[in-house]
Regions:
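PLP-dependent amino-acid enzyme catalytic core
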Residues: 1-166
Length: 166
């Protein structure tokens, strides 16, 4: 992270402005002397704690830009964790309700993190795995036409943000 990035990090009005301002650390003992320079990108420095903050912010802002996510909408998504945390954080900052569908075998701690951002959770049966979680989210979406589902696994904004910023 450059001095300029550090200065920017100290002048932001909300946590979303910090997404992606993650430092690089040179790994000095990974390659032989006079070898390649190897760096690690510390995505854990994102406000929600993972690289998934990038995709959550990107998918929501892309939907806003395209006019399919409007004030008062609810974001719904199937998740196993970090994307859900990112969406819960983005929703909290931007004022959206967030409903996250996850397997019943997800930890209570993970659910508490989501709920601390104001998100609601709906549990799917563990034996159906992620496919069952996605199906349950799609059923809820069909019943609530004002909901928006980012569809992280099919959303072009997901890989695009990595190409642009990671």
């Amino acid at each position: 992270m450059t001095t300029n990035s550090l200065t920017q990090a100290g002048q932001n009005s909300n946590s979303l402005q910090l997404v992606g301002l993650t430092p690089l650390v040179k790994l000095n003992n990974v390659v032989p002397t006079n070898g390649a320079n190897v760096y690690a990108k510390l995505e854990c420095f994102n406000p929600g704690g993972s690289v998934k903050d990038r995709i959550a912010k990107a998918m929501v802002e892309d939907a806003e830009h395209r006019g399919i996510l409007k004030p008062g909408s609810t974001i719904i998504e199937a998740t196993s964790g970090n994307t859900g945390i990112g969406l819960a954080m983005v929703g909290a900052v931007k004022g959206y309700q967030v409903l996250l569908v996850m397997s019943e075998n997800m930890s209570a701690e993970r659910r508490m993190i989501l709920e601390s951002f104001g998100a609601k959770t709906e549990l799917s049966r563990a034996e159906f795995g992620m496919e069952g979680t996605i199906e349950k989210a799609e059923e809820l979406l069909a019943q609530n036409p004002d909901y928006f589902m980012p569809e992280q696994f099919n959303n072009p904004a997901n890989p695009a943000i990595h190409r642009e910023t990671t």
